[in-house]
């Protein structure tokens, strides 16, 4: 079994880690950073950019730069109305699925495809670091992700060419990293406020056992929302002063968003931040600028509602775990947004404890995923992880009521069977609506789809006995089977109508990704060979000038001819010729260098010979004076 990497696929930033020598190691990306922005962009030349390089050009290319795609993964259009208004690219409807429009390619992407490009970069960078291809991974998701979002994350991994061995909850991964070497039993509360989601989990940790007692959260709350309140404040202030709504200009909106994120980060350490955006827009009177000072107090006032929303999941998780705040030993803070002083203060106020800040909030989730990868690969022993399902699962029954089969915070994997019957005489099929959520009425919960069992022998209502089994695997993903006890007929049911991609769509995306990966590599190879050729042309010209008359003209002429040919090939973008000429010119330069050394050695030997003769003539001199040496004291 090859190396299994752990990947924290974040809303704003992602991170990859691996077990090395029994210890988890965070892997820096190709640019040298330990976290990678979860951003994918396509340039006007149709080149794909991923990570920091994609984020840098977002202001100039807002409609073709995709970020916060995690907020759309595994969700239907009617579930992302608010989120779709907060991004600079177009979010479109395709049936009930979400699609992200890329004008420069005249194409639509699923959010899973965008997430896959981030996963591909992380796995490729990890592969370069480890010196082997990476094709297996453990990927983390927010604890409060529903079945569709978990399946969609797995699909993203498949599109990226990865076998996803396990989907693990982010707070659980953080607890693994925190508690790996701890022997004493502790009850910990993981407070995970990331870029787009918020989770709280309560766990019992000790001696290699990690048992999740409860989990709660809000998949609509994260750092992006804190950025938004600053953006709204900047836009409202500018509109009041200038009468222009900057939110209608996608390029201006992108600049505001970047400035808001920067100010938010600065305000974690400073009491105020200067926001200066020159030439944000223009009117007939001339250019307009944003110039504003944002204090920490003002920011906390703007974000007070968001901070208050963090309170409820903490209280709910403690209630579900049947624990008081006094029974919690440690509060582990996870996610970049937990650096905000107001968030730390809220946690201290609610729990009565100072948060434990010994873990790196940006990396701890990936580290935990790597540990789980080590467990699955057999590298890490004596670790037992007992996770839970975050939301209840059930079916719609008579009157539009949700009847729960598996309640939230049930340890997974788990299996539950219930017996149902028909509602009318002579009924030969049953349609069952599968739901996920905590509300009493079916219409208020998340619909995972419907399934239908045919071939039931006609009988009076209430007589047929149909066993329905819900099975949740270790990834928290649901499968359903049904059996008619009367006929003995058993059928495996695949849920349809959910917001995840079909198998055919996933396979097509896998092939597209592989094709694009090949095309991208070819494009990169062409760029590399051209850069190499241009560098060689310059170095050759410089070297010939420095050598001057130290080499014979015939050797210089051969090198110069190759240099001119290579320069012409680079100007014509003739890559095959470039490859050949680069090798030829390098050989000529090696020969030229060798001849220079030979001439230099010959000259040195000649000089040594002259010196030797001079020494011999000195030895033959008889006019030698003898003298005594006396030390002077």
Curated annotation (Swiss-Prot):
Region described as Disordered: 600-633
Biased composition annotated in UniProt, kind: Low complexity: 608-619
Induction: By stress conditions e.g. heat shock.
Transmembrane domains' residue ranges: none
Positions of modified residues (Phosphothreonine): 197
CDD domains xref list: ASKHA_NBD_HSP70_DnaK-like
One MF term in the entry's GO annotations: ATP binding
Annotated organism of origin: Prochlorococcus marinus (strain SARG / CCMP1375 / SS120)
Amino acid composition bias (Acidic residues), ranges on this chain: 620-633
Protein name: Chaperone protein dnaK2
HAMAP family: DnaK
SUPFAM superfamilies hit by this protein: Actin-like ATPase domain (SSF53067), Heat shock protein 70kD (HSP70), C-terminal subdomain (SSF100934), Heat shock protein 70kD (HSP70), peptide-binding domain (SSF100920)
């Amino acid at each position: 079994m090859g190396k299994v990497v752990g990947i924290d696929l974040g809303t704003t930033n992602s991170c990859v880690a691996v077990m090395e020598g029994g210890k988890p190691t965070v892997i820096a990306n190709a640019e040298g950073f330990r976290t990678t922005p979860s951003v994918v962009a396509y340039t006007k030349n149709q080149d794909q950019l991923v990570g920091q390089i994609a984020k840098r050009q977002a202001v100039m290319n807002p409609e073709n730069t995709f970020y916060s795609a995690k907020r759309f993964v595994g969700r239907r259009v009617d579930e992302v109305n608010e989120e779709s208004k907060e991004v600079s690219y177009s979010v479109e409807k395709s049936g009930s699925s979400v699609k992200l429009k890329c004008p420069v390619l005249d194409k639509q992407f699923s959010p899973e495809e965008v997430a896959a490009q981030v996963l591909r970069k992380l796995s490729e960078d990890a592969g370069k670091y480890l010196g082997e291809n990476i094709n297996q991974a453990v990927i983390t998701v927010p604890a409060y992700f529903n079945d569709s979002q978990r399946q969609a994350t797995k699909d993203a991994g498949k599109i990226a060419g990865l076998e996803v061995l396990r989907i693990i909850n982010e707070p659980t991964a953080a607890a693994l990293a925190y508690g790996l070497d701890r022997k004493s039993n502790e009850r910990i509360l993981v407070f995970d406020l990331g870029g787009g989601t918020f989770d709280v989990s309560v766990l019992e940790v000790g001696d290699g056992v990690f048992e999740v007692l409860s989990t709660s959260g809000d998949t609509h709350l994260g750092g992006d929302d804190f950025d938004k309140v600053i953006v709204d404040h900047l836009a409202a202030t500018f509109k009041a002063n200038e009468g222009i709504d900057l939110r209608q200009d996608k390029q201006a909106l992108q600049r505001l968003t970047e400035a808001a994120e920067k100010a938010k980060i600065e305000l974690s350490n400073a009491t105020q931040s200067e926001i200066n955006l020159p030439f944000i827009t223009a009117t007939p009177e001339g250019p307009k600028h944003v110039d504003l000072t944002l204090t920490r107090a003002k920011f906390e006032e703007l974000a007070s509602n968001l901070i208050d929303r963090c309170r409820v999941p903490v209280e709910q998780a403690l209630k579900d775990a049947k624990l008081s705040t006094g029974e919690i030993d440690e509060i582990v803070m996870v996610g970049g947004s937990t650096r905000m002083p107001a968030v730390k203060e809220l946690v201290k106020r609610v729990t009565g404890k100072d948060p434990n800040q010994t873990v790196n909030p940006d990396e701890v989730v990936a580290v935990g995923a790597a540990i789980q990868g080590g467990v699955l690969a057999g590298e890490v022993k004596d670790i037992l992880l007992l996770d839970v399902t975050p939301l209840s699962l059930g079916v719609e029954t008579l009157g539009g009521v949700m009847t729960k089969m598996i309640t939230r915070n049930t340890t997974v994997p788990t299996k539950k069977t219930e017996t149902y019957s028909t509602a009318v005489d002579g009924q030969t099929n049953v349609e069952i609506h599968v739901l996920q959520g905590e509300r009493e009425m079916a219409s208020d919960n998340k619909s995972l789809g419907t399934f239908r069992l045919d071939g039931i022998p006609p009988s009076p209502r209430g007589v047929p006995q149909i066993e329905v089994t819900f099975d949740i695997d270790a990834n928290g993903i649901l499968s359903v089977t049904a059996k008619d006890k009367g006929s003995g007929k058993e059928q495996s049911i695949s849920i349809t109508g959910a917001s995840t991609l079909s198998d055919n769509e996933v396979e097509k995306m896998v092939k597209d990704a592989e094709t694009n990966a090949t095309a991208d590599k070819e494009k990169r190879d062409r760029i590399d060979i051209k850069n190499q050729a241009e560098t060689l042309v310059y170095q050759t010209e410089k070297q010939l000038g420095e050598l001057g008359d130290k080499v014979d003209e015939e050797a210089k002429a051969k090198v110069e001819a190759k240099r001119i040919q290579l320069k012409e090939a680079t100007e014509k973008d003739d890559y095959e010729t470039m490859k050949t000429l680069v090798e030829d010119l390098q050989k000529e330069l090696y020969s030229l260098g060798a001849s220079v050394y030979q001439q230099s050695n010959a000259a040195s030997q000649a000089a040594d010979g002259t010196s030797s003769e001079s020494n011999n003539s000195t030895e033959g001199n008889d006019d030698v004076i003898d003298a005594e040496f006396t030390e002077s004291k």
